[in-house]
C-alpha cells in the first residue's frame, strides 16, 4: 500500500468518524478548543457611541407616531450594538434603551423576571409606580425596578419626558429564565408624592429599619441626585485636603448600594456615578464584563479600545469585555456607568487590569 493510498484510507475513516459524531450529536473538542478557550476574552460586542442629539429627535418622532398601550407596552428604543446585527442588545448581557412618554400618557402595568432601572438625564413630571409605590422621576435620579415587581409609568405634565432604561434582558434570555405577566389596566395609584414609601423607610443614611430583613435587591427605590452630587463634591473637596477617597487623582466615584446588604443595588447590574475634574485623564482599565456609560453633564474624550469618542451630555458608549477604556475631561464631567460585574463576581470570573497614566 502506497503512502497516498494510506492517507486516502485514513481520510475516509476520519470522514466516517466525523459523520458518526454528527449523527450522534457530538462535536470533537480538538476541532473547537481555540474558540472555546481563547487566551483572553474575544467579545462579539464592539465599542460604539450613540449621540443624545441624534437619539432624542428620533424618540420625539416616535412619540408622535407610535402609541403606548397593550402589545408594545413601552415606547422604548433599544441600543443595538453593531456586533449583534438585528438584535436589540448593547452587550451580551445588558439591554439599554431610551424610553419616551408623552404629555399625560400612561405606560401600563406589567412585571418580568428581568431587573431594571431608570436613569434621568433631563426632565421631570413622570412617576413610576413600583408595586404600588409612586416614585417621582427627576433629573439625575436613579430609580430601581427589581425583578418581578409590577411597574407602570404616568406623565402628569403637559411636557414629554425621556430617560434611560437599563435591564439584564440578554443575560436572562441566555439563561432561559424569563417570565412576563401583564398587570391591571388601571393604574395602581395616581398619587404623586414628593417621596416614595421606599424612600421614607430606607432613605436615611446609615440607618435601616430593624424590623425588615435583608433583600437581594435594594428596597430603596430612588437614589436622588442631590445625595449623589453631594457625595461626589465631597470626595473632590477632601482630595484637595489630603484625605483619601477618590478612585485616582481628580476622579471621584460612588456606587449605588443595597442598604440591607451593602452590596450592589441590583443583583445582576452594577450602577455607579463618576465625576472627573476638568483636565483629569484616567488610567486605562480593562475589566471582564461589559459596561455602558452615559454623560450626565460636561464634555470629555473616551478612548475605548482603538476608538476615540468625543462625548457630551446624554451621549452613550459601550465598553465590551476586556476592552481598555480611559477618559479625558475637557470640563468637569459627570458620567453614569452600569455594568454586569456583579454576575462575574458571583461566578468567580471577575478580573481587572489597570494601566499607567499616559
From Swiss-Prot:
> Could you say what a knockout of this gene produces?
Cells lacking this gene accumulate gentisate.
**Entry annotated with the keyword Oxidoreductase:** yes
Q: Where is the composition biased (Basic and acidic residues)?
A: 187-202
Provide this UniProt record's keywords sorted from A to Z.
Answer: Aromatic hydrocarbons catabolism, Dioxygenase, Oxidoreductase
Task: Tell me what reaction this enzyme catalyses.
Answer: 2,5-dihydroxybenzoate + O2 = 3-maleylpyruvate + H(+)
Q: Which part of the chain is the Cupin type-2 domain?
A: 99-165
* Region called Disordered, residue ranges: 185-215
What's the family?
A: Belongs to the gentisate 1,2-dioxygenase family.
Q: What is this protein called?
A: Gentisate 1,2-dioxygenase
Induction conditions: By salicylate.
Question: What is any one GO biological process for this UniProt entry?
Answer: catabolic process
EC category name? oxidoreductase
* Function as written in the Swiss-Prot or TrEMBL entry: Involved in the degradation of salicylate via a pathway involving coenzyme A derivative. Catalyzes the oxygen-dependent ring fission of gentisate between the carboxyl and proximal hydroxyl groups at positions 1 and 2 of the aromatic ring to form maleylpyruvate. The substrate specificity is strong, since salicylate, catechol, protocatechuic acid, homogenetisate, 2,3-dihydroxybenzoate or 5-aminosalicylate cannot substitute for gentisate in the ring cleavage reaction.
Amino acid at each position: 500500500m502506497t503512502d497516498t493510498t494510506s492517507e486516502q484510507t485514513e481520510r475516509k475513516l476520519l470522514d466516517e468518524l466525523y459523520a458518526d459524531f454528527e449523527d450522534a450529536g457530538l462535536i470533537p473538542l480538538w476541532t473547537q478548543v481555540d474558540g472555546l478557550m481563547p487566551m483572553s476574552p474575544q467579545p462579539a460586542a464592539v465599542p460604539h457611541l450613540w449621540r443624545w442629539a441624534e437619539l432624542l429627535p428620533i424618540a420625539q418622532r416616535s412619540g408622535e407616531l407610535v402609541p403606548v398601550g397593550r402589545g408594545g407596552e413601552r415606547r422604548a428604543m433599544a441600543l443595538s450594538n453593531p456586533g449583534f446585527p438585528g438584535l436589540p442588545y448593547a452587550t451580551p448581557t445588558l439591554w439599554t434603551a431610551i424610553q419616551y412618554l408623552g404629555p399625560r400618557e400612561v405606560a401600563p402595568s406589567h412585571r418580568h423576571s428581568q431587573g431594571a432601572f431608570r436613569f434621568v438625564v433631563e426632565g421631570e413630571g413622570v412617576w413610576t409606580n413600583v408595586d404600588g409605590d409612586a416614585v417621582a422621576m427627576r433629573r439625575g435620579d436613579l430609580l430601581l425596578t427589581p425583578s418581578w415587581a409590577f411597574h407602570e409609568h404616568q406623565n402628569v405634565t403637559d411636557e414629554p419626558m425621556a430617560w434611560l432604561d437599563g435591564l439584564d434582558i440578554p443575560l436572562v434570555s441566555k439563561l432561559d429564565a424569563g417570565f412576563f405577566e401583564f398587570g391591571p389596566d388601571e393604574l395602581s395609584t395616581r398619587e404623586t408624592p414628593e417621596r416614595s414609601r421606599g424612600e421614607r423607610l430606607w432613605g436615611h443614611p446609615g440607618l435601616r429599619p430593624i424590623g425588615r430583613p435583608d433583600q437581594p435587591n435594594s428596597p430603596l427605590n430612588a437614589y436622588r441626585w442631590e445625595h449623589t452630587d453631594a457625595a461626589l463634591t465631597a470626595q473632590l473637596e477632601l482630595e484637595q485636603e489630603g484625605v483619601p477617597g477618590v478612585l485616582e487623582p481628580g476622579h471621584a466615584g460612588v456606587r449605588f448600594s443595597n442598604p440591607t446588604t451593602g452590596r450592589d443595588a441590583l443583583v445582576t447590574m452594577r450602577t455607579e456615578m463618576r465625576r472627573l475634574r476638568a483636565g483629569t485623564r484616567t488610567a486605562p482599565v480593562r475589566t471582564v464584563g461589559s459596561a455602558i456609560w452615559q454623560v450626565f453633564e460636561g464634555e470629555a474624550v473616551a478612548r475605548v479600545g482603538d476608538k476615540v469618542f468625543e462625548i457630551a451630555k446624554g451621549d452613550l458608549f459601550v465598553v465590551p469585555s476586556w476592552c481598555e477604556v480611559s477618559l479625558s475631561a475637557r470640563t468637569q464631567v459627570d458620567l453614569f456607568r452600569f455594568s454586569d460585574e456583579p454576575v462575574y463576581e458571583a461566578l468567580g470570573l471577575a478580573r481587572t487590569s489597570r494601566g499607567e497614566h499616559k
